[in-house]
Amino acid sequence: MLVLGIESSCDETGVAVYDSESGLLSHALHSQIATHRVHGGVVPELASRDHVNYLVPLVDEVLTKAKIRKNQLDGIAYTAGPGLIGALLVGSCFAKSLAYALNIPALAIHHLEAHLLAAKMETPSLDFPFIALLVSGGHCQLIEVNNIGEYRLLGDTLDDAVGEAFDKTAKLMGIPYPGGAVLANLADQCLSTPYQFPRPMTDRPGLDFSFSGLKTHALNTWNQSAKKQGDRSEIAKAFQQAVVETLIIKCKRAIKESQSKRLVVAGGVGANKALRSALQKWINDIKGEVYFPALEYCTDNGAMVAYAGCLRMMRGESDGGLGVMVKPRWPLA
């Protein structure tokens, strides 16, 4: 089965072709960072316009790379939520229209489910069940994954998502958008820090997260410093250490409670070097398994949508009719 995947939930336009027999045939991505940098953050209207401009060229590009024609496609999967409503509508309307023209099924895909399954796309031997740590700009969740569509929410953020906390902390210290990755790089390059930040919500039971207080702590520390580059790096180091250790403490609890030793990391923050290294070391110590998507599949992309769509379409699933229903807010579990 050949499935075209379309991702347009926020500020990246992703398109890919996945084959149920051969795997991922091609994928392409357009990032809108340059479009939004001047505004200091994502502007929804501009995001939608960029998707309109790039969807057709990207579809043509991936089909050419895969050496297939549109009429060879068996289905089209598209992100239907959660995300920016305008951006979602651009992708969904395009997908439904193209599917109608080709007389093939279209299927709405949950953005977070696509992230959860990204590691399985590269490692088909990854079996259910597993615990997933979903860490991105909009989400920070621990999820028990028992099968496709069978999810149980174990823990969620009570305020900022972890990627959001990185970006906001960077902005508070004068790092331009998108600052989260820059903040992480500063932390990685800093050998040591005199600062010790709190590990929020680790002094009580439960698997929920909270990062807004950590962000405030970083701001207060920055304001009390000389505000030199060295101070910025040391604060970044302390902030990242606190985030990583907090995530690991919660993962340890989730693994212990579930009695599973299989962990999957998903979402854009899954590309963080310090987090990957710390999780790998801990999992090795307990003789467990941890799966990370390749860096290019951590952030939003069309490949994960095409893969999730292929898995569901092979079970006979598809949208009914031409109605386009996107869900800016759409709980996974």
UniProtKB/Swiss-Prot annotation:
Primary enzyme class: transferase
Q: Which GO terms describe its biological process?
A: tRNA threonylcarbamoyladenosine modification
As recorded in Swiss-Prot or TrEMBL, the protein's gene is named: tsaD
Q: Where does Fe cation bind?
A: H111, H115, D300
Q: Name one GO molecular function term.
A: iron ion binding
Q: What does this protein do?
A: Required for the formation of a threonylcarbamoyl group on adenosine at position 37 (t(6)A37) in tRNAs that read codons beginning with adenine. Is involved in the transfer of the threonylcarbamoyl moiety of threonylcarbamoyl-AMP (TC-AMP) to the N6 group of A37, together with TsaE and TsaB. TsaD likely plays a direct catalytic role in this reaction.
Q: Does the keyword Metal-binding apply?
A: yes
As its record notes, the protein acts as a catalyst of: L-threonylcarbamoyladenylate + adenosine(37) in tRNA = N(6)-L-threonylcarbamoyladenosine(37) in tRNA + AMP + H(+)
UniProt cofactor note: Binds 1 Fe(2+) ion per subunit.
Q: Where in the cell is it found?
A: Cytoplasm
**HAMAP family documented for this protein:** TsaD
Q: Which InterPro entries match?
A: ATPase_NBD, Gcp-like_dom, KAE1/TsaD, Peptidase_M22_CS, TsaD
Name the family the entry cites: Belongs to the KAE1 / TsaD family.
Which GO CC terms are listed, alphabetically?
cytoplasm
Cofactor(s) required for function per UniProt: Fe(2+)
Task: Cite the entry's keywords alphabetically.
Answer: Acyltransferase, Cytoplasm, Iron, Metal-binding, Transferase, tRNA processing
Q: What is its EC number?
A: 2.3.1.234
- Species of origin: Legionella pneumophila (strain Lens)
Protein name in the entry: tRNA N6-adenosine threonylcarbamoyltransferase
